[in-house]
From Swiss-Prot:
Enzyme class, first EC level, given as a word: hydrolase
InterPro entries named in the record: AB_hydrolase_fold, Esterase_phb, Plant_Biomass_Hydrol_Est
Recorded superkingdom: Eukaryota
Organism, scientific name: Thermothelomyces thermophilus (strain ATCC 42464 / BCRC 31852 / DSM 1799)
Record's protein name: Feruloyl esterase B
Length: 291
């Protein structure tokens, strides 16, 4: 009886300690009424890093939480995951309105930054180790955050996204929008793209986020030219030029583009890959310096 009771208590204790995705309803300035979900592992690193993980169109925080193995890596490495969720525009992120494209002005971007600040305060997080990643619309928002809030994010990883400001002024940025100019590969000069980012935070002279850009070469929804344009943009902003192309990295069928010494900007293009998530958690976390 004693053994059985002890085992029952142990199981109950383990159940109570098991981390899970939790909604936070009050986290600060939230002009577009987006939702915040957070995953805090049971064993946190001292002054833990924070990753913002952004879902695609039609997705949700819960869907993206289950869509990668990042929660398992968080358990093993003690970092916090924030999963923003938008109920607007077919669950697509606002990447087109001036507010979200301008530092401190509003939009989805400001709500997400509020989530970051809340998390850093509540869990004594490391403000120098805040990162963003996302697929499709989430990748697009990752670029917006890196452009509008370079003082918040140390690095980003964009999967099947578009350049910062690519959809500026559009009525919406959903797959159902009649205006698909951006997603079909809108082209500008590197200087023009770079100016979009610099103008998002006028007068800012601090460091800029390190960026990785991933895209499938068979993507017809968001054309691979979009990734080329994003690389032009960040190459201009970060002041690095293409120095090397390596086949078979991170796996057969992929080509890696290295800019400068590779520490600030990298691009990856996959043969036979359409519009699909290609998140390699180990590669991502190595880029963020978390493993």
């Amino acid at each position: 009886m004693l053994v059985r009771s002890f085992l029952g208590f142990a199981v109950l204790a383990a159940t109570c300690l098991a981390a899970s995705l939790q909604e936070v309803t009050e986290f600060g300035d939230n002009p577009t009424n987006i939702q915040m979900y957070i995953y805090v592992p049971d064993q946190l690193d001292t002054n833990p890093p924070v990753i913002v993980a952004l879902h695609p169109c039609g997705g949700s925080a819960q869907q993206w939480f289950s869509g990668t193995q990042l929660p398992s890596y968080a358990d093993d490495n003690g970092f916090i995951l924030i999963y923003p969720s938008t109920p607007h525009m077919s669950n697509c992120w606002d990447i087109q309105n001036p507010d979200t494209l301008t530092h401190g002005q509003g939009g989805d971007a400001l709500g997400i930054v509020s989530m970051v600040n809340y998390t850093l305060d509540k869990h004594s997080g490391d403000s120098s180790r805040v990162y963003a990643m996302g697929f499709s619309s989430g990748g697009m928002m990752t670029n917006q955050l890196a452009g509008s809030y370079p003082d918040v994010f140390e690095a980003g990883a964009v999967y099947s996204g578009v350049a910062f400001g690519c959809a500026a002024g559009a009525e919406s940025a959903t797959p159902f929008s009649p205006n698909q100019t951006c997603a079909q590969g809108l082209q500008k000069t590197a200087q023009e793209w770079g100016d979009f980012v610099r103008n998002a935070y006028a007068g800012y002279t601090g460091r800029r986020p390190r960026m990785q850009i991933f895209h499938g070469l068979e993507d017809t929804l968001v054309r691979p030219q979009c990734a080329e344009e994003a690389l032009k943009q960040w190459s201009n902003v970060l002041g690095v030029e293409l120095t090397q192309e390596v086949s078979g990295v991170p796996s057969p069928g992929w080509t890696q583009k290295i800019y400068g010494d590779g520490t600030q900007l990298q691009g990856f293009f996959g043969q036979g890959i359409g519009h699909q998530s290609t998140v390699n958690e180990q590669q991502l976390l190595q880029w963020f310096g978390l493993i």
